[in-house]
């Protein structure tokens, strides 16, 4: 709420977000805005790298924004369309009634690299690392969506069924969320992420499975 007030934006504004890493942080910001009822948003494909690569103008001036004098009404009634919490997710995992996208590294997915008390992944999750969707030879722009969709389907994802994306801290899954939206997928993010799931001793986990 404080950020929205400071930026002086309302749901009527078209918010364009970008970063310097291909879209993860920018995607996370857009996800937050969607949860708050701000859906008139765009991601700048490739971020600042693509902007500079196209020789577009830049400025070193720091923009000053006058905060609004009144609170913009934040809409939270649709938050459940974009976010899922631990208890709901765990119930669906135990019922094997959910499609999960783990967008961390393969080492994190298999449990070889620990970033929490426990390593591995949520049972049933399929692995597709977030950065795989980025073209490093083209200023970190997204690969063509049909290519990414084909790869996801090859891994067993069903884009006609809802999916939940997660990473370590809901940073990298910010881009996964945006990708899902661009593909017309019914996608939510588990913002508790592995930092919550993997640090709880009662969470079911799977380890040692190498993604195909």
Where are these regions (language model features)?
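Short, surface-exposed amphipathic charged segments that create phosphate/polyanion-binding patches used
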Residues: 56-60, 142, 204-206
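Positively charged, proline/Ser/Thr-rich regional signature most characteristic
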Residues: 1-10, 88-155, 159, 199, ...
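Conserved beta-strand elements of the Class I
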Residues: 16, 99-101, 164
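Thiolate-centered catalytic microenvironments shared by cysteine-dependent enzyme domains
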Residues: 1-87, 92, 113, 172-188, ...
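Short cysteine clusters
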Residues: 167
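Short active-site oxyanion
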Residues: 39-40, 97-98, 161-163
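Cysteine-dependent PTP/DSP-like catalytic domain, specifically the C-terminal lobe
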Residues: 186-212
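Conserved beta-strand segments of alpha/beta enzyme cores
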Residues: 40-42, 99, 124-126, 186-188, ...
């Amino acid at each position: 709420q404080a950020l929205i007030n400071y930026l002086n934006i309302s749901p009527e504004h078209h918010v364009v977000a970008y970063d310097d890493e291909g879209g993860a942080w920018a995607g996370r910001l857009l996800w937050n805005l969607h949860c708050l009822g701000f859906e008139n948003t765009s991601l700048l494909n490739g971020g600042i790298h693509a902007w500079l690569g196209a020789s577009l103008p830049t400025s070193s001036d720091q923009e000053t924004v006058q905060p609004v004098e009144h609170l913009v009404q934040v809409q939270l009634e649709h938050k459940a369309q974009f976010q899922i919490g631990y208890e709901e997710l765990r119930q669906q995992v135990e019922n094997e009634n959910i499609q999960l996208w783990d967008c961390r590294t393969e080492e994190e997915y298999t449990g070889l690299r620990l970033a929490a008390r426990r390593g591995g992944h949520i049972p049933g999750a399929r692995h597709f690392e977030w950065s795989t969707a980025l073209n490093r030879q083209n200023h970190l722009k997204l690969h063509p969506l049909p290519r990414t969709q084909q790869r996801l389907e090859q891994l067993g994802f069903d884009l006609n069924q809802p999916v939940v994306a997660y990473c370590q801290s809901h940073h990298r899954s910010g881009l996964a969320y945006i990708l899902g939206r661009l593909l017309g997928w019914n996608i939510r993010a588990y913002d508790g992420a592995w930092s919550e799931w993997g640090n709880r001793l009662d969470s079911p986990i799977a380890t040692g499975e190498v993604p195909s």
